[in-house]
Amino acid sequence: MSGMEVWSDPPRSCRMEQPATQQVATCSFPQNIKEENAYCLYDSEKCPKSAAATDLSTFPRLTSESCSNNDTTTSGGVPVPGYFRLSQAYPTSKQTLYSNTGQVGASPFVPQSQIRFGTPPSSASTPTELGRKGSEGTSPGHLTCSSEREEAEAAASSANEESSPVPSESNKNSPEKETKGEVKAENGANWLTAKSGRKKRCPYTKHQTLELEKEFLFNMYLTRERRLEISRSVHLTDRQVKIWFQNRRMKLKKMNRENRIRELTANFSFS
């Protein structure tokens, strides 16, 4: 126990004071100081009345803190019995500190309050007003004219596309076929053309038609065996040869009928 007594603090007769931070948190002000805090304003020497009015309306926390600090500095000469106050120990440093913070805090927030609570700027409303005026200024006649122009342009573009046909790949790759087609069109007396000048559809080549015409001269009606032989020699199917002979017989019958009518009409003279 003797060693512990050496290292431990000696017994003190007086009461130890609590640290300053705890005392400041638990300190209480008299009734007259609290009433002054409720009706506190900035001093006329530090800031003008207009700035004080705007700061009081917009920033109540700043004003309450600064007012309480000013009251403590001004009432530093009145000591409170039984309590330790920081204003008694450091009066000058606190005055300079809070006076600087009050000035710095008041200056940057004044333009913000003017911007927020003032009249809205005219530049923000100008584009909307211009858009409304432009929409109101456009008359229905102008809208109808623009719609008619667009329809006319669309119709003209579609007509140009239809009038200019896209050249097929076969025409691009084979110019010789074009010359052959032109030569055939020039021959008006060709047996492939009718009296009206319209070109008939002919799925047979010239060699095939010549072979079939030769066989038709010998025999108008073919047996099945002979039809198969001709189809092999001409590289056609049995059905194609059969259809060609049927059409050729109908054509011959029509030609005979026309010739008979022509002979009968030639004998009678109509006056």
Swiss-Prot record:
Task: Cite the record's Polar residues compositional bias ranges.
Answer: 61-76, 109-128
Cellular localization per UniProt: Nucleus
Keywords from UniProt, A to Z, are: Developmental protein, DNA-binding, Homeobox, Nucleus, Transcription, Transcription regulation
Residue segments, region Disordered? 61-82, 109-199
Q: Which InterPro entries match?
A: HD (IPR001356), HD_metazoa (IPR020479), Homeobox_CS (IPR017970), Homeodomain-like_sf (IPR009057), HXA10/ABDB-like (IPR046333)
Residues in the DNA-binding region annotation: 197-256
- Compositionally biased spans, kind Low complexity: 154-173
Task: Give residue spans, biased composition: Basic and acidic residues.
Answer: 174-185
Q: Which GO terms describe its molecular function?
A: DNA-binding transcription factor activity, RNA polymerase II-specific; RNA polymerase II cis-regulatory region sequence-specific DNA binding
This one is known as Homeobox protein Hox-A10
Organism field: Heterodontus francisci
